[in-house]
Every structure is written in structure tokens, then in C-alpha cells.
Amino acid sequence: MAMISFSFPSPAKLPIKSQPSVSNRINVADRLILRHLNAGDLRGAVSALDLMARDGIRPMDSVTFSSLLKSCIRARDFRLGKLVHARLIEFDIEPDSVLYNSLISLYSKSGDSAKAEDVFETMRRFGKRDVVSWSAMMACYGNNGRELDAIKVFVEFLELGLVPNDYCYTAVIRACSNSDFVGVGRVTLGFLMKTGHFESDVCVGCSLIDMFVKGENSFENAYKVFDKMSELNVVTWTLMITRCMQMGFPREAIRFFLDMVLSGFESDKFTLSSVFSACAELENLSLGKQLHSWAIRSGLVDDVECSLVDMYAKCSADGSVDDCRKVFDRMEDHSVMSWTALITGYMKNCNLATEAINLFSEMITQGHVEPNHFTFSSAFKACGNLSDPRVGKQVLGQAFKRGLASNSSVANSVISMFVKSDRMEDAQRAFESLSEKNLVSYNTFLDGTCRNLNFEQAFKLLSEITERELGVSAFTFASLLSGVANVGSIRKGEQIHSQVVKLGLSCNQPVCNALISMYSKCGSIDTASRVFNFMENRNVISWTSMITGFAKHGFAIRVLETFNQMIEEGVKPNEVTYVAILSACSHVGLVSEGWRHFNSMYEDHKIKPKMEHYACMVDLLCRAGLLTDAFEFINTMPFQADVLVWRTFLGACRVHSNTELGKLAARKILELDPNEPAAYIQLSNIYACAGKWEESTEMRRKMKERNLVKEGGCSWIEVGDKIHKFYVGDTAHPNAHQIYDELDRLITEIKRCGYVPDTDLVLHKLEEENDEAEKERLLYQHSEKIAVAFGLISTSKSRPVRVFKNLRVCGDCHNAMKYISTVSGREIVLRDLNRFHHFKDGKCSCNDYW
């Protein structure tokens, strides 16, 4: 057998075993970094870079650093990005333009525009700038509130003879979204039209849409851009839907969504979230449910659950939030956003403030998700609707524990909570403890001072706002004007109006709307009408404010004329508009007209009537004496009538002396709210009118057992710079003797003219022998009569006497005012709980129908 021999090489010829070369080690390290990045392990990639630095290994080029920086930017981990930049300097690698541009983007998105400037200047020294660099620098300035610098960079770019591309145009147009620079944006649009970039790029079109919406507040121009875009995608459609919502056009947002679907585009989670917001705004539960089903079929429901919770909460017309709770309970993982959406949904329903706080406590107790500043803001708003101050203090303790109490939005919510709870001393302490007060802080506290009629402090706050150049907002003046309107201080209102003119806000739409409301509520409807007529740009709030003003003054014909003019000008009414329309019809007895408008709400404008609209219809029928029709109407409502509806009906039962229906209405009220004093008071009055004194006394006794107190009648009048308040039989005023002398004189004179006191309105059983005389004395001491007497001796004869009352004016006072206007030769303007009465020459503007 032949032997097979093997020949081995000599040791000298064997390959030498060697260490890997430095370049091989660098390639391995680079590949390791890239492998970490491809796996989404950013921290692992940066750790590999640190190992290279420790071992003294220098990467071969800038590609690795560029990849690292882009990953840091995508992950928004700017701390790691800055660490990568430090390593870049340490390794002494010369960046190329791509790497420099990534550095500008890093510092731009981290908000450090000064550092981005340094990088951009370095690029100039080394001749590394390109069009992308210029675009990135413009975007940096534009995104960090330095719009003018962005425009300057664009001008410098053009002066160098460089040709802008789509990214460059997009960056400068976004900078022009500030209203101060829209003119520059329009000039840039001219460049776009000439160079053909207008229709070439989706991003350019989107930036133009934003410029017109944010800078000009012009959705019409934004739509023109959208309509001319050659390429549309889900981003452009979603942008238009979102901007519709931001401008307060939810119906248009839904129309855009339907057009998008019909055009064959698939919606994404951002689209659906915006459309759910539109459904929530319109309270269109039917469409919201259809879209919910669509989201389930599309597999997007998990991405829009927070929007669903919000939508179901806002669409609960009957106060039920069961649907939004069901969506929340079905969620596998609850985020801080979903918890906050649910808490906010409960908070916005004032009757469920306790449940909102319980949810907040549940979130804290579970401990899986930490509340953020939005959660605390909603929790504090819920606390503001509760009467127990201890709850608010407990929530505040949780905010301090998490270091969120100093957050501006949380701190402002705390101030708002104290204001709503009428705890102004606590509100002031919270306000003064703020290290940095912003305009919202001032507005919130100022609103509280106005509510509490502390106008001296309110005007001081206004001075501070202007001195600190915080920029007085429309809300600032709205709060001031709302405060003076509530008390009827027309002098203070006129002072604020002069401030508005001085600050150049006389054409500001929200401010003008507040002025219309203020003058209307202060009894100067003609001045309100002048403000309205001088407005160049009126929205639905402007029209509704004017319509409401006419309605409160009893000018039903002017209400209907203004409403028709509003429709002719293409302005769509809202729910508040119809409350004013129905109220106007109610106060002048236009039953058929009221029915017509009630039915047209949904038929013509797709507005579903709410509880307040049904209450207006009940009031309309009751004032016309149609109690049976009103009762049947209540029983056919699509949801259970609330206390407001039954209270309206009960008041009518007292006026029309219908004891049986009155008892039924009172029982309904007490079933809904056992502590509602109006039910006991009205039923007691019904029994008294019927001569059933024992039953009347029994109602008063039950009130006393429950510690329920009837709101006392109070009237007030502004004389000089002071508000003078009067109560029934009030003798506390320094001029009480002169007031009662004038009142005695007036009573004597008006009796000579035919005035007869209506003693049937004194619903007390008196034991005195001279029963009628005592009843007359009680009538003479009503607060509105005292206030009018004071007004006649304290104000100029050339001005109307303006009196305000917190309750409905009684029939006897109403009759007496007509006579007083005759004997005094003065116009008397009286605002009660429901409306204005203009007494002049023995007649009232309400024609005795109120």
C-alpha cells in the first residue's frame, strides 16, 4: 500500500501572526457605532465613541459623526448631541458641510441659536457654507423667536447672488408667519411666483398656508394657496383641517376631511385627532361615533384614544360622561395625556368636579403615571368648582411635592381656583408669590378683582401690565369690561374705553365685542349700537353681543332685524345667538316667532337645542299664560329637564296662581336638588297668594330646618366714582334722612297722579290692626325705590337715573317707576335679573310685559 506523505512548510515560511492594523481597528469601531445606530441604540453608539476616545482611536472621517448627530436630533436627545460635538472637537476632525449643517440643526432644535450662529460663522471662515446651511440658519432663527434675523439672513443670501431653493423659501416664509412680517412674506411670494417654486414643493405651500393663517388670520388666502397647490397629500389636507380648528371653523374642518376622503386620501392619526376635536367643538356625537368606528377599522384607534376621551366628554349634552369613561377603561396603557383628558372632561362638567378630583386621586394612588402641569391645571380648575377649600390645598401639596407648583400654568390655575372660590386674599398671596408674573397671571388675578368689584386694584394691575410692557391683551380689557358691566358702572366703563383708544385697540375685534356687552349691560344700548356699527370686522360674537343687548332691553323688533342682517351677511349663528333670539321673543310675547326660530335651529343651521334653549321656550309659553302647553313641552324634551327649566315653570305657576302645577314643579326641583331654596320660596308664595297661610309657613319652616336662606333683594346705583348699595328698609346710608324725605315726597305725588300700591304682593300674614297701611309701608321700602330716590337727589337732571337690582323687579315697583318718571321728568333705567326697563313719561319699554 502506497504511503501518502504530507509536506509541511518550514517554520520560516509560515505567515507571521500579527496585531490588527490601526486602520482596521478604526473601521471596526466605525462599524460598531453604525451597528448601534441601525439598531436604534443611540446610547450604545455614543458609548462606543467614548471607548474610541479612551483607546486613542480617531475615526477616519466625519460620516460617523454626521450619523451620530442626526440620530441625536431625531431622538431629541440634545445632551448627547452636544457630547458628540465635544468629541468631534477633541478628535480634531475637520467637518464637511453636511456635518456643519447637522450641528446647526442640533443647536437650532435645542433652542441655542447663539451656538448655531457660532457654527454658521465658522463655516464662513472655512468657506463651507452651502444653500442648506443658509436655510438651516434661517429656520433656526424662525423657530426660536428671532424672525427678523431670519429675514436678514435671507436678504444677505440674495445679496451674495445665491439662488434660493425650496428649503430656503420654506424657512423664510415660516419666519414671516409673525404678523409683523407678513408684508415680507408677500414679497417672497412674488419671488416664488416668478421662479416657479410656488407649485413645485409641498413644504413651500404648507409654509404659505401657515403664514396667512398665523400672520394675517386669513383663512381665505390660506385656502387660495391650498387650491393652487399642484401636489396634495395627507400632510396638506391635515394642515388645512388643523388650521380650520385653530381659527374656530370646526364645520369647515369636517368639510375638508370629507373632501379629503372623497379625493381618495387615507387619513392618519393626526387627521383623525383634529376631526375628533371638530366633533367635540360642535358636540356632534353622531359623527364622532362614526369616526370612532372608522378608527377601529383603520387600526388607528390606539393612536387617537386621548382625542376620543376628549370628544366623548365634550359631546355629553346631558352631562353624562359614561362614553368617555368607557373609552378610558378599554385602554391597555394609560398615559398622562389620557388621564388628563378624562379629568378635564369631568372638570368641564361642573356637576362632576368631585368625580374629577377623585380621578386625580386615583391617578396619584396608582402611581403608574405621574401627573404633569396640564393635569394639575385641570385639577385646580375642578377645585375651583367645589366649596371645600381643603381639597384645593391637598392638590396644591401634591404639586409642591412634584416641583410643579412654580410652573406658570399651574400657578395661574391656583390663582384662578382661589378667585372662583371667592378667596381673594389667598389669590393675592398666590399672585404675589410668583417669581415671574406673565400676562396670564395678571389677567387671572385682575379678573378676580373685577368680579369682587375692586376696581381700584384692577386699574393698578392694568398700570403694572403697561409699565412692564407685557402687552395688554384683549382678555385684560374683557375682564375689566365684564367687571364694570356686572355692576353697571358706566363711568368706569367709559374710562376703560378711553384706555382702549389710547392703546390703539379700538379696532380690536374681541375688545369691541366686550365694549358692546359692557354698554348694553350698563343700560346704554345706543352707545353699544354705535360701537357695533363702527366695527369693520364683525364675527358671530359681535352679532350675538348686539342681539343679546337688544333682547335684554326689550327691543324685539331690532333683535329680529339684526338677526336677519347677520344671516344676509353670511354669518352663521351659534347656540348663544339663539338664546338671545328666544329670550327676546319671550319678553314681548312673540310665541309663533319663537317657535319658528326654535325649529329653525336644527333645520337651517344644524344646531341641536340645549337645555337653555328649552328653558327659553318654557319661559316663552309660560309668559303667554300657556302653562299646560309648557308642561307638555317639558315632558316631551329629548332629555330630562334640569332645575333651570322647572324653576322657570314654577315661577310662572306663582304668577298665574296655579297651585297644583306649582306643587308638581317644586317636587321636581327638590328631587333634582333638595337644597334649592327657590323651590321652597316660590311654593310658599304660591300658597300665600292662595290664602293658604299654614302651608306657606310650613315651606318657610322647612327652609329654616335645612339652613337655606333666601337671597335678599339688593339695588345699587353709581354716583360719582362710587357704587351705593341699598337693601329692603335700608337706613344705613349717610344720606338716609334726605333719601326717605324724597321717597315720601314721591309717594305722595304719585298717589295724587293715580298710583295705587299693590298690597296683594306683600306675601306675609300681618297681625297689626292697620294691615293695609303696614303692607304699603313694606312696599315703599323696597330697595329699588330707595335707590331711585337717592339717584334723583344725587345726579344731574340731564342724565338718566340708572339703577340695578339682583332680583326680578316686583309689579308694584314697576308700576311706581312709571309714575315717578312722570312726576320727576326724568328717565329711569332699571336693570333687574332678567332685563332692562326704560321708564319715561309714564311708560315702560317692556309695555308691562315682562
From Swiss-Prot:
InterPro entries in the record: DYW_dom (IPR032867), E_motif (IPR046848), Eplus_motif (IPR046849), Pentatricopeptide_rpt (IPR002885), PPR_At4g14850-like_plant (IPR046960), TPR-like_helical_dom_sf (IPR011990)
UniProt subcellular location: Plastid, Chloroplast
Chain spans, region Type DYW motif: 752-850
GO MF annotation, one: zinc ion binding
A cellular-component GO term for this protein: chloroplast
UniProt organism field: Arabidopsis thaliana (Mouse-ear cress)
PANTHER family: PENTATRICOPEPTIDE REPEAT-CONTAINING PROTEIN, TETRATRICOPEPTIDE REPEAT-LIKE SUPERFAMILY PROTEIN
Region (Type E(+) motif): 721-751
Descriptive protein name: Pentatricopeptide repeat-containing protein At3g49170, chloroplastic
Type E motif, as annotated region: 645-720
